[in-house]
Amino acid sequence: MQNKLASGARLGRQALLFPLCLVLYEFSTYIGADMIQPGMLAVVEQYQAGIDWVPTSMTAYLAGGMFLQWLLGPLSDRIGRRPVMLAGVVWFIITCLAILLAQNIEQFTLLRFLQGISLCFIGAVGYAAIQESFEEAVCIKITALMANVALIAPLLGPLVGAAWIHVLPWEGMFVLFAALAAISFFGLQRAMPETATRIGEKLSLKELGRDYKLVLKNGRFVAGALALGFVSLPLLAWIAQSPIIIITGEQLSSYEYGLLQVPIFGALIAGNLLLARLTSRRTVRSLIIMGGWPIMIGLLVAAAATVISSHAYLWMTAGLSIYAFGIGLANAGLVRLTLFASDMSKGTVSAAMGMLQMLIFTVGIEISKHAWLNGGNGQFNLFNLVNGILWLSLMVIFLKDKQMGNSHEG
């Protein structure tokens, strides 16, 4: 590709500054979802709203993450990745500060939706630029290592959020998110390369519809994108629902709630670290299959334990930790293969992939909320297991071609 930035041998400080600044922005948007969740109990109390608004905050945030993906990817193909990405960072800073003016839970939730739009820029623009900037082996390593930094958000978020809410108002969290994003803005402005290949082409809705139609007619791409959504949903549902499950349902403290996040997200990081070590020695296909075993075993353990005893939250945590390790091992390779399953420009493909995933997350978190409200931990984890089974079925379709991901070139 003519816009390749560097090979592994040429990866210098300037080249690395771009992914580091991108992951700082990603971190600020992710911690915007995770750190506020333990604080949501204080938010709903302040606005005199019911606890069912707690997971709805994340639902609104993820719905925002789906809202403009269809436009931003193709737009960045034509006017450039840099200006679109930088505009997204500025939008996040503004909406984080605007939430300080919210007067009720409805306004708060609307602003969470507007903040969530910032997620669109990561997948549709930022990660497309990463994929276009580095060769495959280097790219997968960077993606995995970037994921480790980004995953500190759900690891630290609940711990810091639970502690923060005891000493500082929840509004201060959003000032922190805006400050982190501001730092990433200056770094991206300095280091982000321009990798778009269709700059100057006219953007027409007719052509845009045609492009998406071609992408969505690709059965292998759709299977991969849906699989990524279903396999990640149990983790997102846990982040959204765990304050209610642990603090309200199990009557544990916010400190204990924070500690229960550590094994799950620690396992996720461990899976990513193992992936980074194995990438140059194993095929992408074998890494996905390897990760599939802990994914299914972990979800099965969590479901079986909580169906037998609804309050077996330690077994649930253990099962979700095993599952998270598998996610860390399998997902980066699956993202790569899915993105390149279509020959369409990567901005459009990445946007389509992100929209399908966000649709699954938005609907799925609401379903998981009602599953827990109606059937407790057992139904919540059975729902997670169903998502694992859907992922497994889609993987059979996606990897049906024995050559798919069966070389170190993907």
From Swiss-Prot:
Recorded GO MF terms: sodium:proton antiporter activity
Entry function: Efflux pump driven by the proton motive force. Confers resistance to a broad spectrum of chemically unrelated drugs.
Entry GO terms, CC: plasma membrane
Periplasmic side: 37-52, 104-109, 166, 248-255, 309-314, 368-378
Membrane topology: Multi-pass membrane protein
Compartments, record wording: Cell inner membrane
UniProt-listed InterPro entries: MFS, MFS_dom, MFS_trans_sf, Sugar_transporter_CS
Binding partners and assembly: Monomer.
Domain of life: Bacteria
Any matching Pfam family: MFS_1
Sequence intervals crossing the membrane: 16-36, 53-73, 83-103, 110-130, 145-165, 167-187, 227-247, 256-276, 288-308, 315-335, 347-367, 379-399
Name of this chain's protein: Multidrug transporter MdfA
Family as reported in the entry's similarity comment: Belongs to the major facilitator superfamily. MdfA family.
